[in-house]
């Protein structure tokens, strides 16, 4: 059913659940699993929820400096979890730009069968990686979109 799954991540609890659901699907269908983070202009501060992805010494930088590292750590954690669960074909993608449009464009370019994402992100101030864009992705995507609560 699914051969190519794209999962949008932002570090929120909904995105973590989406990653878990997508990992189960990828394992069940022996599908390619691609995790993506999309960055846009960072906020003035990094939320506590995202700080857990950073080492203490890294938290001394500005959000402009921290965002790429946060995204990298989110992707690394998701990739490790998927590989630990037995998914063989796992890839990570880090992009910047308009979040919903970038997710949809990558899904189309990668020929994703489904986009899996959390139903809610980190909110308007803190959601610089994914945010609350699931409704935009649903309206723009040509493939199936699964939102996870």
Predicted feature descriptions by range:
Residues 1-2, 149:
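Absolute protein N-terminus
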Residues 72-115:
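Structural beta-alpha unit
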Residues 55-71:
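A short acidic, glycine-rich active-site loop
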């Amino acid at each position: 059913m699914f051969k190519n799954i794209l999962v949008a991540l932002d570090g929120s609890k909904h995105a973590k659940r989406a990653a878990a659901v997508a990992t189960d699907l990828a394992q069940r269908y022996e599908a390619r699993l691609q995790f993506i983070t999309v960055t846009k202009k960072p906020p003035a501060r990094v939320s506590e929820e995202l700080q857990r992805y950073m080492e203490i010494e890294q938290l001394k930088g500005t959000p402009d400096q921290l965002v790429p590292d946060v995204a990298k750590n989110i992707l690394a954690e998701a990739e490790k979890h998927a590989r630990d669960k037995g998914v063989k074909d796992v890839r990570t993608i880090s992009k910047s730009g308009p979040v919903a449009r970038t997710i949809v464009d990558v899904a189309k370019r990668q020929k994703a069968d489904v986009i899996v994402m959390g139903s809610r992100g980190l909110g308007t101030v803190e959601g610089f990686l994914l945010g609350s864009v699931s409704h935009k992705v649903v309206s723009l995507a040509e493939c199936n979109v699964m939102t996870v609560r």
